[in-house]
Curated annotation (Swiss-Prot):
PROSITE patterns named in the record: RIBOSOMAL_S2_2
Keyword hit for Acyltransferase: no
MF annotations from Gene Ontology: structural constituent of ribosome
First and last residue of the signal peptide: none
Domain of life where this protein originates: Archaea
Keywords, sorted A to Z: Ribonucleoprotein, Ribosomal protein
Pfam families, per the entry: Ribosomal_S2
Keyword Ribosomal protein: yes
One BP annotation, GO: translation
Protein name as annotated: Small ribosomal subunit protein uS2
CDD domains in the record: RPS2
Species of origin: Methanococcus maripaludis (strain DSM 14266 / JCM 13030 / NBRC 101832 / S2 / LL)
A Gene Ontology term for the protein's cellular component: small ribosomal subunit
Family designation: Belongs to the universal ribosomal protein uS2 family.
């Protein structure tokens, strides 16, 4: 496999471990699996991950940043997600997703995004449940063991590793900004910038700071 037409170099993809899955697989994710290693780990197809990343960023670029909600409960994803929100202006929820955020107009931080972006459909199940209830599209980073019946657009990736999630958020941020004409070929931020946030394991998830920004109401 060559680097031609990839969003980053193949070496960068492999070094980040985005292709390293788990020892479980589902029928939903079979089409994204390249092979199984001798130790039983399923390996994702890097080229398919790259393709889906590109398409996800293109889809998201149809939305204003305030109309997108990006969510994660995974500790190592919190820092990269916050950096993602910082560089794109996209609203983020890092840590516990308060029930009713999308469904209860009386909730203190009630929001009406037009699209939801999840780091892990299983861990972020409350956000997914509410997105299904209100009928907005869901993009999800999915590993080999995930069920994807309620995910409208799958990004197959290792969504647990620090390097892999940092690279995912960096590339989607970069492509989102490029597609919207906000940056040129050279992004004013880097993968290392996102990775540095992931390496900070002392991330504080203060309930008062978990959700940032304000949301426009969904267009009727």
């Amino acid at each position: 496999m060559s680097d031609e037409n990839l969003l980053t170099t193949l070496d960068t993809y492999l070094a980040s471990g985005i292709h390293i899955g788990t020892q479980q697989k589902t029928e939903d994710m079979r089409r994204f699996i390249y092979r199984v290693r001798a130790d039983g780990l399923y390996v994702l197809d890097v080229r398919k991950t790259d393709e889906r990343l590109r398409l996800a960023a293109k889809f998201l670029s149809n939305y204003e940043p305030e109309d997108i909600m990006a969510v994660t409960r995974r500790v190592y994803s919190v820092g990269p997600l916050k950096e993602f929100g910082k560089v794109t202006g996209i609203n983020t929820v890092a840590g516990r997703f308060v029930p009713g955020t999308l469904t209860n107009p009386s909730a203190r931080k009630f929001a009406e995004p037009e699209v939801l972006f999840l780091s892990d459909p299983r861990v972020d199940k409350q956000a997914l449940k509410e997105a299904i209830e209100i009928g907005i599209p869901v993009i999800g980073m999915c590993d080999t063991e995930h069920l994807t019946a309620h995910i409208d657009f799958i990004i197959p990736t290792n969504n647990k590793g620090r390097k892999s999630v940092s690279l995912m958020y960096y590339l989607i941020a970069r492509e989102y900004m490029k597609n919207r004409g906000l940056i040129g070929e050279e992004a004013p931020f880097s993968y290392d910038q996102f990775l540095e946030k992931a390496m900070n394991v002392k991330v504080k998830m203060n309930p008062s700071n978990r959700q940032r920004g304000r949301f426009h109401r969904r267009r009727r």
